[in-house]
């Protein structure tokens, strides 16, 4: 991975946890090269980060190229798989792929119907898309941690190239998806209840006074607004961090197991057994995390359609 002089356990772990980052470094920035020399930039420069510090110094506008690349690639692959299944369905010839896709669609549709009791034809396809895409991104965690990063280093010719292959171990990806769900939740809530109904939901719940003491509701508005706003914002944050935390922990365990291969033949054998065992268990984790993300998204969509005034 990193050069031989930097290949310590700490360096190995840090290298695997760093994304391939593209961003802008300011004029006058001093870059530390792999050969020990330094280069001062004469102008603002858009470039790939060579170190974790450079990635940090690029700031908020930096892009994690590996996360975006794998996310888009897996989305396109998923679209190709579903398109192939649809074509086979039109020919009337049964196949393993078609049977699997039908099983997946029926299963997700059943789960969504149990949670979402309103009329919106977009929710079931949304649930299917979210589950499938998150599962595909999680599935990348089963690829041995060194294979694709080493391939990236061979292609670039740079032994210091960073390359993470599991998009869901990047909080930018998981929180990005979560806040997209949050935006849809707000949109559907306003669409179903109106802007006034949405504001009323934020200001008149969970505490409200009886009709005889209606004037007390004015005093409760600040309390309700604070509580509901915190609860609302907590939904996407917890949704994104839950997925990130579980996948990050799983990836870290794979990296720690991979370190055993550098200790010796016996520990390498132990590492192989542990890696196989953890991979088998991790299949459950990646599936469960995709399912939880989909279920919570559906729950939030149902909450957006619920009207408290009807109860």
From Swiss-Prot:
<comment type="subunit">
    <text>F-type ATPases have 2 components, CF(1) - the catalytic core - and CF(0) - the membrane proton channel. CF(1) has five subunits: alpha(3), beta(3), gamma(1), delta(1), epsilon(1). CF(0) has three main subunits: a(1), b(2) and c(9-12). The alpha and beta chains form an alternating ring which encloses part of the gamma chain. CF(1) is attached to CF(0) by a central stalk formed by the gamma and epsilon chains, while a peripheral stalk is formed by the delta and b chains.</text>
</comment>
<dbReference type="GO" id="GO:0045259">
    <property type="term" value="C:proton-transporting ATP synthase complex"/>
</dbReference>
<feature type="transmembrane region" description="Helical">
    <location>
        <begin position="276"/>
        <end position="296"/>
    </location>
</feature>
<keyword id="KW-1133">Transmembrane helix</keyword>
<feature type="transmembrane region" description="Helical">
    <location>
        <begin position="253"/>
        <end position="273"/>
    </location>
</feature>
<dbReference type="InterPro" id="IPR000568">
    <property type="entry name" value="ATP_synth_F0_asu"/>
</dbReference>
<protein>
    <recommendedName>
        <fullName>ATP synthase subunit a</fullName>
    </recommendedName>
</protein>
<feature type="transmembrane region" description="Helical">
    <location>
        <begin position="123"/>
        <end position="143"/>
    </location>
</feature>
<dbReference type="InterPro" id="IPR035908">
    <property type="entry name" value="F0_ATP_A_sf"/>
</dbReference>
<keyword id="KW-0472">Membrane</keyword>
<dbReference type="InterPro" id="IPR045082">
    <property type="entry name" value="ATP_syn_F0_a_bact/chloroplast"/>
</dbReference>
<feature type="transmembrane region" description="Helical">
    <location>
        <begin position="213"/>
        <end position="233"/>
    </location>
</feature>
<keyword id="KW-0138">CF(0)</keyword>
<dbReference type="GO" id="GO:0046933">
    <property type="term" value="F:proton-transporting ATP synthase activity, rotational mechanism"/>
</dbReference>
<dbReference type="GO" id="GO:0042777">
    <property type="term" value="P:proton motive force-driven plasma membrane ATP synthesis"/>
</dbReference>
<feature type="transmembrane region" description="Helical">
    <location>
        <begin position="62"/>
        <end position="82"/>
    </location>
</feature>
<keyword id="KW-0997">Cell inner membrane</keyword>
<keyword id="KW-0066">ATP synthesis</keyword>
<keyword id="KW-1003">Cell membrane</keyword>
<keyword id="KW-0813">Transport</keyword>
<dbReference type="Pfam" id="PF00119">
    <property type="entry name" value="ATP-synt_A"/>
</dbReference>
<keyword id="KW-0406">Ion transport</keyword>
<dbReference type="InterPro" id="IPR023011">
    <property type="entry name" value="ATP_synth_F0_asu_AS"/>
</dbReference>
<keyword id="KW-0375">Hydrogen ion transport</keyword>
<comment type="function">
    <text>Key component of the proton channel; it plays a direct role in the translocation of protons across the membrane.</text>
</comment>
<comment type="similarity">
    <text>Belongs to the ATPase A chain family.</text>
</comment>
<dbReference type="GO" id="GO:0005886">
    <property type="term" value="C:plasma membrane"/>
</dbReference>
<keyword id="KW-0812">Transmembrane</keyword>
<feature type="transmembrane region" description="Helical">
    <location>
        <begin position="170"/>
        <end position="190"/>
    </location>
</feature>
């Amino acid at each position: 991975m990193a050069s031989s002089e930097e290949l310590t356990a700490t360096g190995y772990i840090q290298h695997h946890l760093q994304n391939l980052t593209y961003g802008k470094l300011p004029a006058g920035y001093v870059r530390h090269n792999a050969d020990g020399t330094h280069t001062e930039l004469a102008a603002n420069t858009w470039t790939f980060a060579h170190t974790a510090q450079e990635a940090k110094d690029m700031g908020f506008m930096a892009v994690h190229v590996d996360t975006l690349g794998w996310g888009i690639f897996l989305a396109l692959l998923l679209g190709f798989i579903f398109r192939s299944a649809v074509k086979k369905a039109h020919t009337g010839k049964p196949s393993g792929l078609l049977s699997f896709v039908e099983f997946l669609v029926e299963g997700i549709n059943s789960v969504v119907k149990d949670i979402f009791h309103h009329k919106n034809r977009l929710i079931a396809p949304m649930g299917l898309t979210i589950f499938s895409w998150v599962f595909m991104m999680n599935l990348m965690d089963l690829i041995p941690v060194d294979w694709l990063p080493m391939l990236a280093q061979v292609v670039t010719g740079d032994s210091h190239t960073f390359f993470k292959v599991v998009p869901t171990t990047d909080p930018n990806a998981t929180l990005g998806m979560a806040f997209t769900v949050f935006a849809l939740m707000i949109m559907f809530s306003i669409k179903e209840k109106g802007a006034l109904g949405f504001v009323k939901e934020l200001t008149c719940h969970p505490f409200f006074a009886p009709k005889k003491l209606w004037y007390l509701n004015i005093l409760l508005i600040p309390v309700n607004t604070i509580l509901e706003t915190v609860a609302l914002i907590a939904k996407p944050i917890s949704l994104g961090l839950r997925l990130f935390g579980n996948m990050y922990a799983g990836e870290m365990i794979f990296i720690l197991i991979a370190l055993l291969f550098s200790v010796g033949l016996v520990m390498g054998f132990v590492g192989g057994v542990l890696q196989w065992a953890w991979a088998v268990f991790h299949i459950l984790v990646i599936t469960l995390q995709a399912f939880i993300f989909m279920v919570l998204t559906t729950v939030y969509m149902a909450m957006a359609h619920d009207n408290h005034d009807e109860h």
